[in-house]
Amino acid sequence: MFGQTFPYQDPSLSPAERAADLCSRMTIEEKAQVMLDRSKAVTRLGVPEFAWWSEALHGVGRNGYSTVFPSCIGMAASFDDALLERVFTAVSDEARAKNTAQRRTGSVGKYQGLSFWTPNINIFRDPRWGRGQETYGEDPYMNARMGLAVVRGLQGPADHKYAKLYACAKHFAVHSGPEKMRHSFNIDDLSPRDLWETYLPAFKALVQKGGVKEVMCAYQRFENDPCCGSNRLLQQILRDEWGFEGIVVTDCGAIGDFWKPGRHGVSDDATAASAKAVASGADVECGSDYANLPDAVSKGLISEDQIDVSVRRLLAGRFHLGDFDPDSLVEWTSIPESVIACKEHKDLALQMAQSSIVLLQNRNNVLPLSKTNDTGNIMVMGPNAADSVMLWGIYFGKPTHSVTVLEGIENKVGAVAYDKACDITSMTVTETSTGKSTEAADGSTTLELSVNSERTNTIADILAAAADYGTIIFVGGISPNLEKEEAKVQAPGFDNGDRTSIELPQVQRDLLKALHDAGKTVILVNCSGSAVGLVPETETCDAILQVWYPGEQGGNAVADVLFGDYNPCGKLPVTFYKDDSQLPPFDDYDMSNRTYRYFKGEPLYPFGYGLSYTTFSVGEPVYDVSAGNITVSVTNTGNFNGAEVVQVYIRRPSDTDGPAKALRQFARVELQAGETKTVEIPLTRDNFEWWDPTTSTMRVQEGEYDIMVGTSSDDNDLKTISVTL
């Protein structure tokens, strides 16, 4: 068959059998080369080059044209994992089509492979973390459930011979900033409860329920060992306890952090660092230090047999992806290039952007606006109104066309008055055009912008420009150029990609107050990848929409909501705190007073919150212990068709040290005006897993539990029943 000479060339054998045979024929130098993220070809054995590092955070990234979906935190706000799976099925279609075309040229470069380093299922424990927008929020169950949808969409059906792609759960583990400390930071005092109850459950779910094929180890140290050299994390927990059989990849440059000056300082040099990482279970390095593995073997720091364990794993993965086999055998290679940025995918991007929008405030039902009356009375303002780059978030692809919020509004109602008014943090307004983006070795991206014009406004200038308009749609917030991965950016409220304050930038706050004081109807469209402190804006703005970084179709989605063609149904996947005073120290990983589960104060907007143009009523829940489900009626009591998200939380009253409540299920329900549906939501015994201090494990314990069912995490929005297991 196909002129095979060796067993590894036989597609009828299992990936593990083929990998073992191929590994046995490789030299130690060849083995070291295939353990790098840019795996070079081994020509004498017919092993093609392979790129382990590709990106698909919310669309195929850094690899030419693709469909750009909303940021992950925005997609989490949809509370719709079925829709999310459709999104990532589209993403994997585009990724496979791109890879097939590239392979046929004879060369597969960086970002063009079949291994995609997503999803990010770290817990967004603090709104100041610049990379929180990559996650699915602050709740472990939400990250697990949405992460499972991502894995299903990317990897394809588990029972097929060949995987569609490989997904990667990252960053393992206990990783969420600060960005500027990640290469030297040590977390050595975390309680077992926080580790197992908060930071690990999503990873466990993706390994044991999702069959995720890759896990990425994080930069920082955990209990004095770098995560990529942690025997406890990578061997004892991940492989021994959870049964993970896949590939561990390192974050980019993480092995260098073992030995470079001013970082972790746990290894003398790259050779020793590489030996430590491989011995701990890190199979593929994003970087170049693993080229020193032959030297490590010669010095007795690691055996070739230990290296073979990793090589067999990664080769088995490549065989499973069909990397060695003819396209005629691999079903996924038939996906045509025409799927890339196709109309169906753009429609899906619009649907997800619509579903992600959260209506935070709607005083006197000012929204939706009329499309036919008084549109000449509307003025659009703000630093994000005409900014296409804002739409893309971070780790983005290149859309064939982006619709800014201004364009979306004009698509809906025709030309409207517009003034940028200010930049994100300054009254000096720069009008820019997008230049090129460049990626550093560690994966950080620099977007170079060319400045076309610059002017400095005063509030008086803006009020004069707005004098003839009664309704101001102010598209503000912050920017993915300021909150992102390890950004070398300094601006008021921002530091190296993280935020130093959650408050809306002062220049925007002052403008909104001035517009309000001038008698304008003010609608704030807040664009951000994280929670923003908006206490003054609840007074100065008549309506507030949280639209995140909404992707290439974001402008159309925002316009659909503003003008009533789509009834908002998004819910917050994070707590919106009132101000900075409610936040613990950023570098403290203790969960005390963090997130809705442990926060003791009164938030501005709670986790799970989101308004609608209609109203809903949730009936009394009934729990059937034997069947393992909750039954509850939901009625649309208003005049608009819409969707409500029924949320199910549990708590253990006897556990006074535990969370106030914990999300364990949710269901999105579509209802016509006046319609009632009875919703059945599974709530099985496994959903009652709870921390047991006597065994230091998460397990289902006998006793009393409260089941809380409603429309947000706020007690006032929940109905409670007690059950005994």
What are these regions (language model features)?
Residues 1-691, 697-715, 724-725:
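Glycoside hydrolase catalytic-domain context in secreted enzymes
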Residues 719:
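A conserved ligand/cofactor-binding region detector
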